[in-house]
């Protein structure tokens, strides 16, 4: 059965993987210029790849569930539940790992990103429960898109920190 929004989810999955690959290339180029990768560089690469692959996998999840010929309502609830739980797990570990990797205070952009991710996770869990919102493709698509929006925001903020460290010579 063809789910509504399948083309969008396939495009989002492709974009997510492409974004992850591009982000890693920037870190590799930085390594070529500056030598050994720092703890923050490794955090940067890992978190970008994890978020990109999480968005890609969650984008493909409804199509996978549709192969089992279950009802669309269940597909959107299960997809929302799994994506919401993964996002909470990622966000909480990302918060702790960033502190360990950089040893610097959280920036305003980081805090905003953290809040957006947690709100997105809560939105997904609300979809999964079906009590506040009816589980439909549009809500799920908006939430997974927000995961990629927060990925871009985080990438730009982390890239700025990497470039500042490169110009000041302060690499952890």
Q: Positions of the model-derived regions?
A:
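Small-residue-rich transmembrane alpha-helices that serve as helix-helix interface/gating elements
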Residues: 81-84, 138-153
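N-terminal signal-anchor/start-transfer transmembrane helix
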Residues: 13-33
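Membrane-water interface at the C-terminal end of transmembrane alpha helices
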Residues: 91-95, 124-131, 149-165
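Helix-coil boundary and interhelical linker segments in multi-pass alpha-helical membrane proteins
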Residues: 1-9, 63-76, 129-140
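Generic alpha-helical transmembrane segments
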Residues: 16-20, 50-58, 76-94
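Hydrophobic alpha-helical membrane segments
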Residues: 85-89, 108-129
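Juxtamembrane helix-loop boundaries in multi-pass membrane proteins
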Residues: 10-14, 37-57, 103-120, 170-172
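Hydrophobic alpha-helical transmembrane segments in multi-pass integral membrane proteins
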Residues: 56-64, 117-134
């Amino acid at each position: 059965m063809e789910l509504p929004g399948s083309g969008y989810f396939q495009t989002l999955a492709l974009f997510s993987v492409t974004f992850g690959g591009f982000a890693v290339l920037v870190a590799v180029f930085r390594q070529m210029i500056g030598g050994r990768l720092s703890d923050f560089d490794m955090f940067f690469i890992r978190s970008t790849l994890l978020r990109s692959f999480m968005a890609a996998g969650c984008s493909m999840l409804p199509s996978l569930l549709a192969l089992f010929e279950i009802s669309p309502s269940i597909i959107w609830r299960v997809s929302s539940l799994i994506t919401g739980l993964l996002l909470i797990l990622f966000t909480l570990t990302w918060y702790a790992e960033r502190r360990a990797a950089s040893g610097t205070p959280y920036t305003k952009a980081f805090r905003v990103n953290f809040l957006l991710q947690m709100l997105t996770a809560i939105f997904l869990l609300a979809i999964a429960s079906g009590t506040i919102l009816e589980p439909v493709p549009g809500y799920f698509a908006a939430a997974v898109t927000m995961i990629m929006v927060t990925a871009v925001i985080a990438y730009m903020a982390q890239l700025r920190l990497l470039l500042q460290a490169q110009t000041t010579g302060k690499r952890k």
